[in-house]
């Protein structure tokens, strides 16, 4: 007879453990347990039956895997947390005894990240454990950068210490310096939430969000303790990444930091980069007896003779290539790039290789920019430097680190302005003029001849399109072109605001949309005109025929609906023939009425544009009917499961096509009314 199984020793009761039991087993506090779970990647688990996992469990009880908690017992940080817990217990006992000096001494020995921003333990081994390779760390860098840039712009509070904010800002500026040196920044986008940046590092696309530098209001409904735990982990991660990136390009990490310039809001200018010569190729040194001896002349002559013999075949090949006729079938290098076409007419759009004559990293290298006081200096400076600009000036109130603070410097080629145009004030006296010549600021509304004035959006649109846009479209006070997101991938059938309308719309789509809108607008006018003409004709018939009845005169009230139906293309050949018969009967009726009244029949002029619209609608209706019939025939050969999937696909595609068609119609209407902003 087998041994009776004891309850609670196997199954869910053994596989799961409650949070209270886990904290008691690890002998740490609950906040430290939360930190440890976040750093190690331990998540709560939901058992199938909570009552089987724990009898005293409720709907709010949190469970973890027992093996995960057993794994945390071997973590080195647990010992540091236990020491911290014991030290806090000593402090509370000293305060209970009234020994304030002893409590202050213990407080100085304690490591409190909420006050100092730095702890005794380090997370290096956890970073190496969670990210075995450097590519894994780069793939998880999006949230890291977004969180650190967010905390770098927050004001210091009791929950967010100033040292933590300063460390976040320092790490972010170091990362920006690497992007500037390596020319890794690719795109940027201005949104309501903030500024999106995208960089490509070792083949990995990294996208992060930077908030605008407004005065942030910290509310109490945000748990900064949990966010601070993530920040503590991300600081260590970005420190690892920055070290690896700096050493890969031959720079010393960390770069030299000037605290005095940082206090003057120098930003990127507070750091000075130094090279460590990793990538330099050292020339081999000759081993001598102490004095440099010249080579043997006989040996040197033999070496020169051998070099001439080796280079002779290359010269012969060059001569033959020069004297070869142009008609030979030789492959010639071309600068054209192959275009990837889809395999089927309805296939996905393939990414096309791009070739730019200008290097994006040197897009602004030839220009000197000056940033006005109202423009955001930090993002503009970062983007301009990342795309090759070396000379950037701004007003002295924006901080240190500028190329020049003199707004009237003649070397400035572009000035970024974000204020409405102001009329130039009348000129002052000659004495005031002489003073203004040495001043560093211009009068409001004054313009320097030969300088290009642009709004900040010009810089973002230039880097996203990798070309210099027309500056007159971005002049101060001008209506700016739409700022489109560069991160949207093009999908066949969807509306693309950056592409011309003619390349997106279907065949005869414009005629169909115009005919539909005009028919709705002109239907009342046509009805009124037809009724008026019929009334005049009926009066003439009564006067001339003296009460003679005309066949079909009772159906005159139906002519207006028939007239409206003429513009409808129909759905089949039978309906088309019926429309033609009705049109012929109507024409015969009018001929009889004109003959009785003695008035010549006036032929109605056919508008070629209206006829083209009608033909386009008929053609589209016929094509749609053929596609529906083909689809129905295909569905007959499918199983029920595949038929349901196909119906869902067709429904979603039709919905997307309708949305894209509505957007194209709206754009077509705006362009016709002349309200659209000019496009480059």
Swiss-Prot record:
Keyword rRNA processing (UniProt): yes
Q: Where is this region: Disordered?
A: 312-334, 494-680
Biological process per Gene Ontology, one example term: maturation of 5.8S rRNA from tricistronic rRNA transcript (SSU-rRNA, 5.8S rRNA, LSU-rRNA)
Q: Where in the cell is it found?
A: Nucleus, Nucleolus; Nucleus, Nucleoplasm
Residues of the signal sequence? none
Pfam families linked to this entry: BRCT, Pescadillo_N
Per the record, where are the segments of Basic and acidic residues compositional bias?
584-593, 602-626, 654-664, 671-680
The residues covered by the BRCT domain are: 359-476
Residue ranges annotated as compositionally biased, kind Acidic residues, are: 502-528, 540-559, 573-583
Disulfide bonds listed in the record: none
Q: Gene Ontology cellular component?
A: nucleoplasm; PeBoW complex; preribosome, large subunit precursor
Q: Reply yes or no: does the keyword Lipid metabolism apply.
A: no
Q: What is its main location?
A: nucleus
A molecular function (GO) term: RNA binding
The coiled-coil regions, if any, are: 609-673
Cite the entry's keywords alphabetically: Coiled coil, Nucleus, Ribosome biogenesis, rRNA processing
Q: Give the protein family.
A: Belongs to the pescadillo family.
Oligomer and partners: Component of the NOP7 complex, composed of erb1, nop7 and ytm1. The complex is held together by erb1, which interacts with nop7 via its N-terminal domain and with ytm1 via a high-affinity interaction between the seven-bladed beta-propeller domains of the 2 proteins. The NOP7 complex associates with the 66S pre-ribosome.
Q: Summarize the protein's role.
A: Component of the NOP7 complex, which is required for maturation of the 25S and 5.8S ribosomal RNAs and formation of the 60S ribosome.
Q: What is this protein called?
A: Pescadillo homolog
Q: Which organism is it from?
A: Botryotinia fuckeliana (strain B05.10)
Q: What is the lineage of its organism?
A: Eukaryota, Fungi, Dikarya, Ascomycota, Pezizomycotina
Q: Which gene encodes it?
A: nop7
């Amino acid at each position: 007879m087998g041994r009776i199984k004891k309850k609670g020793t196997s199954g869910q009761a053994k596989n799961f453990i409650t949070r209270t039991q886990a904290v008691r087993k690890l002998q740490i506090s609950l906040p430290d347990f939360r930190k440890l779970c976040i750093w190690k990647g331990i998540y709560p688990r939901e058992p199938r039956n909570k009552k089987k996992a724990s009898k005293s469990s409720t709907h709010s009880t949190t469970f973890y895997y027992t093996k995960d908690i057993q794994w945390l017992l071997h973590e080195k940080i647990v010992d540091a947390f236990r020491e911290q817990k014991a030290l806090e217990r000593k402090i509370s006992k000293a305060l209970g005894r009234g020994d304030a000096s002893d409590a202050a001494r213990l407080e100085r020995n304690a490591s409190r990240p909420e006050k100092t921003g730095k702890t005794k333990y380090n997370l290096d081994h956890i970073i190496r454990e969670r990210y075995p390779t450097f590519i894994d760390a780069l793939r998880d860098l999006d949230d890291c950068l977004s969180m650190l840039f967010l905390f770098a712009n927050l004001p210091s509070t009791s929950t967010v210490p100033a040292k933590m904010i300063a460390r976040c800002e320092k790490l972010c500026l170091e990362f920006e310096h690497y992007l500037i040196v390596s020319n890794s920044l690719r795109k940027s986008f201005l949104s309501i939430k903030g500024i999106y940046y995208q960089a490509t590092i070792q083949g990995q696309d990294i996208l992060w969000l930077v908030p605008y530098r407004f005065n942030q209001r910290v509310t109490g409904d945000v748990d900064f303790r949990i966010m601070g735990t993530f920040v503590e982990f991300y600081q260590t991660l970005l420190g690892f990444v920055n070290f690896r990136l700096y050493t890969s390009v031959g720079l010393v990490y960390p770069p030299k930091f000037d605290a005095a310039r940082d206090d003057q809001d120098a930003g990127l200018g507070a750091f000075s980069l130094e090279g460590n010569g990793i990538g330099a190729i050292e020339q081999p040194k000759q081993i001598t007896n102490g004095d440099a001896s010249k080579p043997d002349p006989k040996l040197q002559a033999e070496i020169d003779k051998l070099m001439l013999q080796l280079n002779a075949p290359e010269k012969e090949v060059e001569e033959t290539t020069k004297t070869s006729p142009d008609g030979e079938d030789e492959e010639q290098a071309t600068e054209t790039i192959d275009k990837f076409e889809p395999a089927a007419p309805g296939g996905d759009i393939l990414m096309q290789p791009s070739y730019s004559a200008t290097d994006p990293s040197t897009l602004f290298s030839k220009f000197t920019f000056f940033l006005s006081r109202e423009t955001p200096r930090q993002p503009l400076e970062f983007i301009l430097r990342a795309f090759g600009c070396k000379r950037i000036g701004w007003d002295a109130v924006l901080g240190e680190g500028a190329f020049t603070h003199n707004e009237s410097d003649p070397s400035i080629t572009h000035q970024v302005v974000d204020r409405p145009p102001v009329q130039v004030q009348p000129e002052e006296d000659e004495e005031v003029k002489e003073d203004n010549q040495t001043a560093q600021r211009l009068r409001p509304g004054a313009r320097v001849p030969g300088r290009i004035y642009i709004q900040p959006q010009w810089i973002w649109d230039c880097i996203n399109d990798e070309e210099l846009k027309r500056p007159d479209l971005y002049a101060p006070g001008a209506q700016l072109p739409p700022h489109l997101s560069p991160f949207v991938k093009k999908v066949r059938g969807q509306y693309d605001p950056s592409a011309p309308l003619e390349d997106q719309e279907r065949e005869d789509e414009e005629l169909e949309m115009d005919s539909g809108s005009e028919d709705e607008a002109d239907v009342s006018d046509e009805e009124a005109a037809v009724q008026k003409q019929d009334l005049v004709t009926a009066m003439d018939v009564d006067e001339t025929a003296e009460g003679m009845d005309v066949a079909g005169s009772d159906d005159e009230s139906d002519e207006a609906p028939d007239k409206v139906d003429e513009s409808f293309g129909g759905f089949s050949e039978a309906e088309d023939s019926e429309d033609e018969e009705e049109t012929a009967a109507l024409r015969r009726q009018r001929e009889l009425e004109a003959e009785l009244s003695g008035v010549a029949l006036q032929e109605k002029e056919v508008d070629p544009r209206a006829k083209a619209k009608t033909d386009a609608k008929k053609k589209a209706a016929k094509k749609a009917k053929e596609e529906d019939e083909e689809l129905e025939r295909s569905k007959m050969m499918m199983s029920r499961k595949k038929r349901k999937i196909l119906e869902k696909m067709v429904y979603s595609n039709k919905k997307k096509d309708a949305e894209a068609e509505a957007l194209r119609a709206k754009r077509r209407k705006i362009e016709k009314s002349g309200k659209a902003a000019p496009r480059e």
